[in-house]
Amino acid sequence: ALNTSLGLGEIDAVRATIDEDEIGDFLPHVRSIIAYNAESKVVETMRMNGVLISQIAPNGGIISGSSSVVQLDAWNWEDAVISYDQGIHLNWPSPYSRSGYSYYRGPSVIKKSEKYESNIEEIKNFFDSSKAYLNEPNPNPVSLPYKAMSSVFSGRSTVFLHANYEKQIKDGVKFLQEQKIKNIVVVGGTNSLQ
């Protein structure tokens, strides 16, 4: 099972058991493997149905954090891990916004997002700030989000680009190539051919 929050949440009604979505927009330093619960009832159910390996990925924000690959037959996260922090998850903003269905207005309407360009600029600023931070010989104060980007810029980590529309995919891949990111994987792409 790829790109799943399996083992990061147990009971949806109890916020304290949900570790898949942290607060904040740029969280490349958040490691999903640390929160992985190998003894989750959901993990046991998946294993009984033949799923033996899974990529545990965080959700939410613009950069959600790093994912790891685990085997589902383990006592704890240290035993479960196959590949640590293999990449970060970048949720590319949608170029479209949707108005909700209303009894008075009728069905929802899809239109161009007014915030699309400013959201992309925010991502660009984060990448530029990360590079500037990493080029400092002794950065002070320490910034964990910027520091976590070093493996992305060096090519040791993959960027999992979450995008569904054709424009999102093209813009996201173009941006990452301009940033000289070597390892890019598109996640989703459900509306890419429309």
Language model features by range: what are they?
Residues 170, 190-194:
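Catalytic core of soluble alpha/beta enzymes
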Residues 42, 47-183:
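Polyanionic/metal-chelating signatures
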Residues 6-8, 61-64, 192-193:
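Short gly/pro/ser/thr-enriched loop/turn and capping motifs at secondary-structure boundaries
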Residues 34-38, 62, 190-191:
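Short, glycine/acidic-rich beta->alpha junctions
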Residues 1-49, 54-57:
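Metal-associated gating/positioning segment near the N- to mid-region
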Residues 185-189:
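Short internal beta-strands
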